[in-house]
Amino acid sequence: MRQRSNTFFLLFAIVTAMSLVTAAVAMAATIIGDNGPNNLTGTDQRDRIFARGGDDTINALARADRVIAGQGNDTVNAGAGHDDVSGGDGNDALDGGRGHDRVLGGEGDDAMEGGGGFPGRRGDELHGNAGNDNIEGGGGYDLITGNAGLDTLNGGGGCDRIFAGPDNDTLNGGAGNNFRRLRCERLHGGAGNDTSTGGVGRDFMSGGFDNDTQSGGNGSDKIFANQGRDVSDGGNGRDVLWALSRKDVTAIGDLEGDELSGGEGNDRFLVRDGEKDLIHCGGGNDRVIADQYDQVDPDCERVEIRTITSLDQVQDDEENRTEAPSEDQDEGPTP
């Protein structure tokens, strides 16, 4: 009996020791670099990695990690999981990996990727900072914002919300195409001269505060020419092109306005903004509501000219609103 009891206690001690070792291995790590160039690798748990200064390479591996790259030209691969990545100052390359990640660029020219997302699900948040950033969304529903600098913002494969910054940015909707949603890609210009291209599906596009160029591409798009002299092209599909009244208008018929092209498809134009707009209908059976200051191409099938006699008539009419309606209007950066 004594020998059997000793054997039991010995086995209990071994199992307990193994459990403690396993628990220690499973614990998340806090990894801290120094001010030199570091090569830091996380564990398969929820790690916190602080690289500090220097040109660092960081591989966070799996799970939901928090990575702060610090100053320097850093390369971060966050790996699978719902990660929180901050680039810091310097020209960084930041990849969120698979999962819905939050990636923040710092000052510098950053290249940021959301990584492989989950189609039809919540995607990544990718936010640029000062510098000329190149931001690429993933496969989910991403939120992408530019900031100061000449940014290129690409939506990727999901239905995305993209907001330009205060400078001259390029926005691309990507391959998102979900016909169950009224508008898949939503592209919003900022305070600069932005160039926006819609995706393959139904897009919502709004120019910003300067002279913007917008192209809807394939799909039935809704395009708003906002403040400034914008050029809007609906492309293929049944598009709605809207010329909004500019806030700097002091007299009707006094400003050169927007240029709107419908492209192929049965398009609709709403252009009663009191400016001298150009309207090109293109193929299809199109409808135009314009004012007496607009130049409408003769190929437009159904044209209704509504006379405007005062600036108050322009600004008070719901059709001539001075900003685009959108469920996203409170989510983007304020110019």
Question: Where do the language-model regions lie?
Answer:
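Bacterial N-terminal signal peptides that target proteins for export
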Residues: R2-F12
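Disulfide-bonded cysteine-rich modules in secreted/extracellular proteins
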Residues: I31-G33, L311
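Ser/Thr/Gly/Pro-rich low-complexity, disordered linker/stalk segments of secreted
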Residues: D312-P335
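Leucine-rich solenoid repeat scaffolds
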Residues: L270-S310
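Glycine-centered beta-turn/loop sites at beta-strand termini
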Residues: G33, G42, A51-G53, A60, ...
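Sec/Tat signal peptide C-region and signal peptidase I cleavage site
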Residues: A24-T30
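Consensus positions within tandem repeat domains that build extended binding/scaffold surfaces
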Residues: P37, R46, D55, A64, ...
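Bacterial N-terminal signal peptides
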Residues: L11-V21
